[in-house]
């Protein structure tokens, strides 16, 4: 959720730090992007339908997600979703996706 908030607020330095931490912790960056895609899709569903039952958002963060979904214009969430979808295609066969992920997230922040 944090990375979506910094993309929306146009803070390009934050995604770099988040991705670097995930990388240093030895976590799978491709899996992170897949999970991010699912999360942004759920935010779009929430924004469009206002029905939290159509999402897989955990109850403990639902209130924050509702705020993000209602305060963010749907075109902006769709732009983020489109960028993440494109990123998923690009990293499919990438051996070291860190640089590609960082660059795509910077672009999303500065759009």
Enumerate the language-model features and the residues they cover.
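Extended, largely alpha-helical regulatory/partner-binding modules appended to the mid-to-C-terminal parts
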Residues: 1-111
């Amino acid at each position: 959720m944090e990375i979506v908030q910094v993309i929306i607020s146009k803070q390009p330095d934050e995604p770099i730090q988040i991705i670097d931490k995930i990388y240093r912790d030895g976590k799978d960056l491709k899996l992170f992007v897949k999970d991010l895609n699912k999360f942004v899709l759920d935010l779009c569903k929430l924004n469009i339908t206002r029905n939290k039952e159509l999402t897989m958002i955990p109850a403990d963060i639902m209130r924050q997600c509702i705020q993000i979904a209602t305060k963010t214009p749907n075109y902006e969430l769709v732009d983020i979703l489109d960028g993440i979808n494109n990123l998923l295609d690009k990293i499919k066969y990438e051996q070291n996706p860190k640089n590609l992920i960082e660059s795509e997230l910077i672009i999303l922040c500065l759009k």
